[in-house]
């Protein structure tokens, strides 16, 4: 917490990570193995690093100084910020303080303004993306698939978390979803979290936990089981159902998370580059 005359002017959440590169996005870009101890902004699962209430360079300088001292006290090898939006004031401020800014991933967004239904979203897509989403919905319906959106606290969060963990394990990050921590955290969010569930019969084949803020609808975590019958893919179904809910709630922006570039670009999302800004302690 940065204070000026006793008044809070900036705040920086940080996390101490043993194995600072769980997604493999830093090694090869920085001289590290990925197993080092690091003190980083937010957590890797947050794709929107920032310094809330950042007002001027003195605030950032003070925050960076405190971050460096805390990293030293904790025995960290590296400190800094990950998932910093390219072109943001934070990135400009960090590079001005001597941090290198290295591109590590892209985040994807969809502007929902002017859309009043999921069909209007489909209609705005290029032919390939439009046909894919409509075809998947039709085939899935014929194969007995249904989907629903409800408050996350009312859903079976252990079941959803298990599917998310199974999906993440294919990329080496299954440990991101420990059952008790995941279910407790999501349930504690109350109305800020919703669950999107896709089932074939009674079997959960795709699910997502989405977060709301005042203007955005975030596709925060998801899992998919591709062992289905009927010639469709569950992931496009989950995506369409999630966008449909975001539109129904009147959100201005759909946050589609990181990665899966080909699918997201095909289906109308725009990319925003994310950088890492790290220094050795």
Where do the protein language model's features map onto the residues?
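Acidic/polar loop patches that form or flank catalytic/metal-binding clefts of enzymes
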Residues: 171-175, 193, 251-256, 272-276
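A conserved beta-strand-loop-helix scaffold within acyl/acetyltransferase catalytic domains
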Residues: 1-34, 78-231
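Acyl-donor binding region in acyl/amide transferases
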Residues: 19-102, 214-271
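Conserved catalytic-core motifs of GNAT/GCN5-like acyltransferases
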Residues: 102-110, 271-281
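Short alpha-helix boundary/capping motifs
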Residues: 188-189, 267-275
